[in-house]
């Protein structure tokens, strides 16, 4: 069986483009997770209005990552962020911080 250089080159190019797009996806996911975690931490440090704004930003980042990757940990983090927003909206900051912390915990598993 004769191996043609063009065939080998096309396979190598396919593998390179696939690995590059995978690297872009990984970078996007890391950035989305980092932005989500940063928004949660900033929200936990502020007052109720700031917390709501940062948690809503965190939810937006997490939802965009969830839509792209369909990952269970991100889905659970979105769930906890939604609960944190509900608690912050009711001025129950301790419960909001607890749920924000749980969201961070689930996002931590994604960073590994």
Across the structure, where does each feature detected by a protein language model lie?
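Classic N-terminal secretory signal peptides
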Residues: 1-24
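Long, charged/polar, soluble alpha-helical segments
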Residues: 20-112
